Structures are given as structure tokens and as C-alpha cells.
């Protein structure tokens, strides 16, 4: 039996600024000698300090996700604290890593791209693929927590990945090469996983269900189910994507750990209750991907509307869109079933 895997993720704009702390954490974890468990480490970085610490990262086989938005113009929103362009330094460091540790680079390094008004899916994909032989993971800007006075500026910057991809003259080639990194294949995979009668998660699925399956409202994670994120101030969050107002507790070396499971359950259930009625009538409840903690004003006293709510007509369009995609791409079904869902 393969040993269980634990995952430690270092996530912030530039985690390498706190390298002594990272070393301390890893030394502590390694001193535990945990039986039957392999601990792996991951990090997201903009590569600014990569030249100083790449030896250590390669030694520990860090899973490294490098934030890069394409060529120099594409990447121009990423600047230093003094406002200077960071592209040349970032690229030089990534090039050095690839040259110095080619095997590590091939196995453990990937790229993350944020789409905005200075790049396109086409440009980013080709730049990173041609230079590094990697497929970037392309995402849109996070829409939560935007200040009211910055909303217009944000709207001008925002680009939808699926819409942008469809505008490319090489659309068909891109989605075929991107595969699960493309919104189309990602949606089809979820559609088949949830609604195809030929997908079985375990042997228990082979037995006929006598009653309808119950689903937890929304598509978010139950706290501590998948990961845990601790801020620099010691606040415990369910993950790095949600606001700090949804803190689960506090970890501070100078005081006792403040982590009440009952309070966490009460808070989580309170927010679920605010959406429960909508979830009961939502046609996407079986395959919901909406994290409730990313819904604006979830923590307010006002009544909220889930942006992922889907009525009968919208669901019909969702089914039609996925079926149409598989009709136009006859190999999509077999490819997803064999490569991803098998």
C-alpha cells in the first residue's frame, strides 16, 4: 500500500521573503518522522528571489507554481514595491532554474497566469509553451473583495477565460492542447462525472439507490476537508482564496491556540442556512462549483442571491452546451473518460 501523502503549501505574493521561517517549518516536520506518510511541499512565487533559494527548493523537491502572465507587456502589471517592471529579473531566474535543474524543472515546476486586459489566452499559452515547454494554468481575476472606488478600474481589467479563448483564431488547436486546462474540457469533465451513468466512484455506486442522494448546499469545501491556510498574522482560513472575515481561529506562538470546532461548525452552518432555500430549487445542486465564501456580502445581514443559482432554462442550456461540444468534438467523451475519469 502506498504511503499517504501530506501537502504543505506556502502561498503568498513572495513567500521567499520569509525563507528562514520556511526552513524552520520543514526542519520541524522532518524531525517528526511520521510513519506511513510522505510530506510534500508546494509554493507559489513570482520568481523574484528564485536565484537565491532555488538550490534548497530543488533539494526538497518543492512543487513550484510560478506566477507569470506572458511576455513583457503581458506581465507588466507585476511590478516591484518601487513600481519597477519585474519581468526581466523573473525570466532570468526561471531560465536559470531550468538550466541548472532540468529534471526538477520538468517534474515539479508549473506556471500560473492571471488573465487581464494586457494579455490573451493565446499569447500567454504560446509564450510559456514555446519558452518552457509547459502549459500554464490560466485563471480570471478574483472578483471578491473589490473596493467600491476601484470597481470600474477592475471591470476594465477583467477578462473571462472562456470568452477570451473563443476569440482566438487558433481556438480548436488551443483547446485540444490545453485539454483539462481549458474551460470547455473542464466543464465537460464535471458534466460527465456528475451525470454520466458510466462513472463509478466506488463499488457502492454499482448498487441501485433506493432514494435520492442528499447534497450539502453550495459547492464549497467543508472546513479542513481539503486544506488549511494560515495568514502571516496567524489567522486560520479554509483556503487562501477567501476573505479574512471568515477566519476559523487563530494560531499564535505566544498564546494558546484559539480553534473551537463548535464555533466553526456554527459559523459554517449559519452561512449555509442563508443559501439553503436557493440550493433546494437550484438545478445545479448536484454539480455546484460555487464556493459560498466568495459570494459578496455573505457576512452581511442582507438577503443574498447566489451568483451560481441555475433555473430550469439555464440548466437546459448548460446540458445543451456540453452535449453540443461533445458532438462537435467526437473524441472528447472517450478522452475525458479514459484520461481523467478512469
What annotation goes with each model-predicted range?
Residues 76-91, 95-219, 223, 229, ...:
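Radical SAM enzyme [4Fe-4S]-AdoMet core and its adjacent flexible, acidic
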Residues 1-7, 11:
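Single conserved hydrophobic/aromatic residue that forms the stacking wall/gate
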Residues 69, 227, 235, 240:
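Conserved acidic functional residues
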Residues 235, 241-342:
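Flexible mid-to-C-terminal extensions adjoining Fe-S/redox cofactors in radical SAM and related proteins
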Residues 223-224, 303:
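Short acidic, Pro/Gly- and aromatic-enriched capping/linker segments at domain boundaries
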Residues 5, 29-36, 97-106:
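Alpha-helix termini
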Residues 15-60, 64, 68-74, 81-89, ...:
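Canonical radical SAM enzyme core domain
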Amino acid at each position: 500500500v502506498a504511503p499517504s501523502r501530506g501537502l504543505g503549501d506556502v502561498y503568498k505574493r513572495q513567500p521567499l521573503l520569509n525563507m528562514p521561517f520556511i526552513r524552520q517549518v520543514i526542519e520541524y516536520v522532518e524531525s517528526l518522522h511520521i510513519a506511513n506518510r510522505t510530506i510534500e511541499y508546494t509554493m507559489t512565487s513570482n520568481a523574484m528571489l528564485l536565484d537565491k533559494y532555488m538550490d534548497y527548493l530543488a533539494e526538497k523537491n518543492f512543487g513550484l507554481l510560478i506566477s507569470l502572465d506572458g511576455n513583457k507587456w503581458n506581465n507588466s502589471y507585476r511590478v516591484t514595491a518601487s513600481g519597477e517592471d519585474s519581468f526581466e529579473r523573473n525570466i532570468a531566474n526561471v531560465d536559470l532554474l531550468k538550466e541548472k535543474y532540468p529534471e526538477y524543472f520538468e517534474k515539479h515546476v508549473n506556471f500560473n497566469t492571471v488573465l487581464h486586459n494586457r494579455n490573451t489566452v493565446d499569447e500567454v499559452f504560446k509564450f510559456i509553451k514555446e519558452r518552457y515547454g509547459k502549459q500554464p494554468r490560466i485563471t480570471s481575476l478574483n472578483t471578491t473583495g473589490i473596493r467600491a472606488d476601484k470597481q470600474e478600474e477592475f471591470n476594465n481589467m477583467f477578462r473571462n477565460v472562456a470568452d477570451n479563448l473563443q476569440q482566438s483564431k487558433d481556438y480548436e488547436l488551443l483547446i485540444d492542447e490545453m485539454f483539462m486546462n481549458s474551460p470547455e474540457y473542464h466543464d465537460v469533465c464535471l458534466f460527465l462525472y456528475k451525470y454520466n451513468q458510466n462513472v463509478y466512484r466506488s463499488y457502492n455506486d454499482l448498487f441501485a439507490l433506493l432514494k435520492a442522494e442528499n447534497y450539502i448546499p453550495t459547492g464549497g469545501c467543508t472546513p479542513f476537508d481539503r486544506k488549511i491556510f494560515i495568514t502571516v498574522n496567524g489567522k486560520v482560513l479554509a483556503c487562501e482564496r477567501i476573505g479574512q472575515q471568515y477566519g476559523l481561529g487563530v494560531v499564535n506562538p505566544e498564546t494558546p491556540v484559539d480553534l473551537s470546532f463548535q464555533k466553526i461548525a456554527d459559523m459554517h452552518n449559519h452561512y449555509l442556512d442563508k443559501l439553503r432555500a436557493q440550493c433546494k430549487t437550484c438545478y445545479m445542486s448536484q454539480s455546484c462549483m460555487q464556493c459560498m465564501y466568495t459570494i459578496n456580502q455573505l457576512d452581511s445581514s442582507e438577503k443574498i442571491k447566489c451568483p451560481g443559482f441555475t433555473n430550469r432554462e439555464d440548466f437546459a442550456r448548460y446540458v445543451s452546451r456540453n452535449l453540443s461540444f461533445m458532438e462537435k468534438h467526437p473524441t472528447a467523451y472517450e478522452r475525458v473518460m479514459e484520461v481523467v475519469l478512469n
